[in-house]
Amino acid sequence: MDYNKAALEMHESHHGKVGIVSKVEVKTRDDLSTAYTPGVAEPCRKIKENPEDVYNYTFKGNMVAVVSNGTAVLGLGDIGPEAGLPVMEGKAVLFKEFGGVDAFPICIDAHDAASVIAACKAIAPTFGGINLEDIKSPECFEIEETLEKELDIPVFHDDQHGTAIVVTAALINALRVVGKKMEDVHIVLNGPGAAGTAIIKMLMTAGAKDIIAVDQFGTLYKGCNSAEAHKNWLGEVTNPRQIKGGLKEALAGADVFIGVSKPGILTTELCKTMNQDAIVFAMANPTPEIMPDEAKAGGVRVMATGRSDFPNQVNNVLCFPGLFKGALSVRARDINNEMKLAAAYAIADLITDADRSEENIIPGAFDPRVAEAVANAVAKAARETGVARL
């Protein structure tokens, strides 16, 4: 199927993928007077008296803003807000179709962090949560961290944490397959950008103790003096053995390779230098860091990619619909590490001991159990950690 042609036809024939649908009918004068003036004044008064009533009288409780400035859209790069709109519409569709969550795409003409932060704060009263999307690094770090501190609704950068949660879920099961423990394995991550950094943080939360991050210049270590602040931080908290060099040096004896970088960077020969029962997650799209057959030829036992045409697809759609569904259901003020880890285990635990195998470590994107399982786990963790209003 020619997906490019099909996508153009879909978008043009429907003039986009989302629209506003009224929940009520306005067929009579009474309907009009109830839905709008004069009747609408009463819920306005109630909300004025008690701002929390906005969740009872409006769509806020199930509405997420999908916010982007179009500076890091898929593999297209900085294409601007207008060109990024089809992606944000698509994200809104996935929220609704997979999680029953209403979402509205908002593409803003704002390039610096301060402008994006100001825009999000200005629109926050309308929404129960904000999903940040396709905002370039390093600005995305400052934007998310600031909004998390200054807003009382959940803010979630899916490119970072959605990826991290699903990777963690997949690795939990991959380690179960090979009989290793998170706290014992040596993990190498290639590509410590936004997603890579979040993956490292999530794996550390899950118990990983020996992680090495590798960028285009080599391993990150204490005093590596990177031009990027987050990489200096990674150098301080990872690489406990202070291994210096490149990917070759980092991979020697490694149990796990996680790639969020570029095609072809991992070779069969490099895989042969890894530990027995090696695990490789090659998630560069559309062409991974190594193809599955090449990895298997190098002795890799469990392989995952970001592609749907290979087993073990690492796909963010397993996370964000259910995650926001759970957070919104308890009116969470935040999405904290405990909620993220709960989501990862909820995804992983859907694969039973009987079904788990080298080629089945994570549910498929259309598994109907996923969103509900994630939502329940996230809501429970929110209550247990004190960020839930309900």
Stretch-by-stretch model annotation:
Residues 232-301, 307-309:
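Rossmann-like adenosine-cofactor binding region
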Residues 69-71, 79, 108-109, 134-137, ...:
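Short, ordered loop/turn segments at secondary-structure junctions
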Residues 74, 79-99, 151, 157, ...:
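Glycine-rich phosphate/diphosphate-binding loop of Rossmann-like nucleotide-binding domains
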Residues 158-159, 178, 282-390:
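Adenosine-phosphate binding glycine-rich loop
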Residues 55-60, 96-97, 122-124, 148-149, ...:
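Solvent-exposed alpha-helices and their adjacent loops that cap or buttress functional pockets
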